[in-house]
């Protein structure tokens, strides 16, 4: 046989057919897939954001994923949470396409209407509403007069994992394509990953080279952690009945790309925007730099295990009244970095914070039940400062624990929180109010055994260079 059923037709196959005098062959038509986003709060990328609005991430991602898997994607825009308007748009989409994919409106709240509309669009209607996946539980699957209708969860990571796990196999079958074959590697998990029994859980990971093979660091959990996709190399799956994946487990990692490139320089520890300034010359030189923000304490633990080159830290020792040096273990040495100001961040004009000291501002926030905070992840030096200020108090928002200063500022700027703690350069960049608390030492614990590696030397040179110091100063840091 020249070509078998199911073969993907490319330039090579077309040439073979032409050589045999064959001008036409029957092929599977690319299924037409309509994509609708739902929600009053959605704004298309490129448009300005108003308070309480967010960019429509899912529409863009789902459209691209459909194309990658053999479909002809037709993005029809975002529809408000208005039931008659949404029903009209869904009927029109189903009339002209082979499949309809929506995002949002699948939960059972008063404002989520997509799943209610499906019942009127054709039989048999909804076949599954809610699946044992995390993230992705609210997924809704339906068939309306022979056409698949899928309502993905509104949170981006939930939407993408459920799309690839549940929808891609059906879409590729409709397109006449073979099942997706993702590259996989085995890696060791350096930290315990807690899970929730009863649902299979997907956890995104970043891969680094350890002394005995690949190490897979969790790079962010949560339904809305879209930035984690940019940092992750792939994901692992925790079984439905498991309540954890213990540290040291050898796990199978499904890669997002066909190949993984192990980074030349690995930085694990505290987050700081100054890192981007220092590592920019390395990236321009073609080096792959991986920075994993897990906090100062987590970074120190990684450095002791030999899983990184540098661990950025900012830990104050009350006994010696010094930063960082007392926390070093054998095999680590301190590299001075820069000074940065930590403080309370808030929206300008908020009278609960404007003109106050840090202590008075925190008291005012705790006295107002409507005042919502945004915290930082456990193990972060910033989290230690926050907990010292709060004492035993656990205000609303305390368990919202992003991994970066940028995420804290974004939560406040977008009215998802009223206050948090971040560094002055990030507050300035977001045009937010700022109450200084303390200038801290942001330094690096260097793994001595890796000191002579070319990428390590390049980082040290960039840190000490006049250009690097000038860039840090201009951004609001004070080089050591």
What are the functions of these language-model segments?
Residues 262-271, 358-383:
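Short loop->beta-strand "edge-of-pocket" segments that line small-molecule binding or catalytic clefts
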């Amino acid at each position: 046989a020249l070509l078998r059923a199911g073969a993907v037709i490319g330039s090579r196959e077309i040439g073979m057919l032409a050589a045999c005098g064959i001008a036409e062959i029957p092929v599977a038509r690319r299924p037409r897939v309509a994509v609708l986003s739902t929600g009053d709060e959605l704004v298309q990328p490129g448009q300005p954001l108003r308070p309480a609005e967010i960019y429509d991430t899912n529409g863009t991602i789902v459209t691209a994923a459909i194309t990658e898997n053999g479909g002809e994607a037709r993005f029809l825009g975002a529809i408000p949470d208005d039931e008659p308007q949404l029903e009209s748009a869904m009927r029109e989409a189903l009339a002209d396409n082979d499949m309809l994919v929506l995002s949002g409106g699948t939960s059972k709240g008063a404002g989520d209407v997509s799943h209610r509309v499906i019942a009127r669009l054709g039989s048999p209607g909804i076949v599954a509403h809610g699946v044992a996946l995390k993230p992705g539980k609210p997924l809704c699957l339906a068939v309306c007069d022979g056409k698949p209708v899928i309502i993905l969860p509104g949170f981006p990571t939930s939407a993408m994992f459920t799309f690839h796990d549940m929808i891609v196999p059906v879409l590729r079958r409709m397109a006449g394509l073979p099942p997706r074959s993702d590259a996989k590697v085995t890696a060791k998990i350096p930290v315990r990953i807690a899970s929730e029994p009863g649902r299979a859980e997907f956890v995104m990971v970043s891969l680094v080279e350890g002394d005995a093979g690949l190490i897979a660091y969790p790079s962010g959990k949560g339904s809305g952690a879209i930035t984690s996709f940019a940092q992750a190399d792939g994901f692992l799956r925790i079984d439905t009945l498991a309540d954890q994946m213990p540290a040291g487990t050898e796990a199978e990692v499904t890669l997002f790309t066909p190949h993984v490139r192990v980074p030349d320089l690995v930085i694990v520890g505290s987050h700081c925007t100054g890192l981007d300034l220092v590592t920019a010359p390395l990236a321009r030189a073609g080096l792959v730099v991986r920075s994993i923000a897990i906090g100062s304490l987590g970074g120190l633990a990684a450095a002791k295990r030999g899983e990184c080159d540098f661990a950025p830290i900012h830990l104050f020792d009350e006994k010696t009244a010094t930063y960082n040096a007392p926390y070093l273990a054998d095999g680590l040495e301190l590299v001075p970095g820069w000074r940065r100001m930590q403080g309370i961040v808030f929206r300008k004009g908020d009278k609960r914070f404007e003109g106050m000291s840090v202590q008075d501002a925190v008291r005012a926030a705790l006295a107002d039940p409507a005042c919502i905070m945004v915290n930082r992840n456990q193990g972060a030096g910033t989290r230690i400062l926050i907990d010292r200020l709060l004492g035993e108090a656990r205000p609303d928002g305390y368990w919202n624990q992003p991994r970066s200063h940028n995420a804290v500022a974004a939560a406040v700027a977008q009215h998802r929180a009223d206050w948090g703690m971040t560094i002055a350069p990030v507050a300035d960049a977001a045009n937010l109010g700022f109450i200084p608390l303390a200038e801290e030492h942001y330094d690096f614990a260097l793994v001595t055994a890796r000191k002579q590696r070319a990428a390590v030397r390049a980082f040290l040179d960039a840190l000490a260079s006049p250009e690097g110091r000038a860039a840090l100063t201009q951004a609001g840091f004070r080089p050591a």
